């Protein structure tokens, strides 16, 4: 199955000059969605994983489905004010400025094995922020998995010390 056939390309979104890779069309197709999750699971099937950590919002969609497939827990990473309990945070760079991600401070215990998951890796900033939070809690990052990689933005370089798995490259 050619997964690129299920990704909609939207020119000039969210701003002029950007070609947005829209995964909603893949998610809508039950066969393509199942195939993508199955293939992502195959890429890391040899790893023992306690948790998948995924950032809102599309990371929740891919990460929770993958956690179900791998029979492990899912830990949501959110923006400020969205988690009800005490949190840790990590700032990361955006194209113009910075943002901050948050995770519950008791989400991971020392030595627990974690896979970082998101729908897409571009600059690597979101993935690196999630990795740093896992390591603050003394978890072990076993790698990362992404549905899509935008290769020209070289985000893989930010997290090259960890295994990176990708299904679709642009």
Curated annotation (Swiss-Prot):
Pathway noted in the entry: Purine metabolism; AMP biosynthesis via salvage pathway; AMP from adenine: step 1/1
Predominant location: cytoplasm
Subcellular locations according to the entry: Cytoplasm
A GO biological-process term: AMP salvage
Record keywords, A-Z: Cytoplasm, Glycosyltransferase, Purine salvage, Transferase
GO molecular function: adenine binding; adenine phosphoribosyltransferase activity; AMP binding
GO CC terms in record: cytoplasm
Domain of life of the native organism: Bacteria
Known EC number: 2.4.2.7
Catalytic activity: AMP + diphosphate = 5-phospho-alpha-D-ribose 1-diphosphate + adenine
Top EC category: transferase
Entries under NCBIfam families matching the protein: apt (TIGR01090), PRK02304.1-2 (NF002633), PRK02304.1-3 (NF002634), PRK02304.1-5 (NF002636)
Subunit structure: Homodimer.
Family, similarity comment: Belongs to the purine/pyrimidine phosphoribosyltransferase family.
Job description of the protein: Catalyzes a salvage reaction resulting in the formation of AMP, that is energically less costly than de novo synthesis.
Protein's name according to its UniProt entry: Adenine phosphoribosyltransferase
Originating organism: Brachyspira hyodysenteriae (strain ATCC 49526 / WA1)
Gene name as annotated: apt
């Amino acid at each position: 199955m050619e997964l690129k056939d299920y990704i909609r390309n939207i020119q000039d979104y969210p701003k002029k000059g950007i070609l947005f890779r829209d995964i909603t069309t893949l998610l809508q197709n039950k066969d393509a969605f199942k195939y993508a999750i199955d293939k992502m699971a195959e890429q890391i099937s040899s790893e023992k994983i306690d948790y998948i950590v995924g950032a809102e919002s599309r990371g929740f969609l891919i990460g929770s489905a993958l956690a179900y497939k791998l029979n492990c827990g899912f830990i949501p990473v959110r923006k400020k004010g969205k988690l009800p309990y005490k949190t840790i945070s990590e700032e990361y760079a955006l194209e113009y400025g910075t943002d901050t991600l948050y995770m519950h401070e008791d989400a991971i215990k020392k030595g627990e094995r974690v896979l970082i998951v998101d729908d897409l890796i571009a600059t690597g900033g979101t993935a690196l922020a999630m990795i740093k939070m896992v390591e603050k809690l003394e978890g072990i990052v076993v790698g990362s998995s992404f549905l899509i990689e935008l290769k020209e933005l070289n985000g893989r370089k930010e997290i090259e010390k960890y295994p990176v798995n990708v299904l679709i490259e642009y």
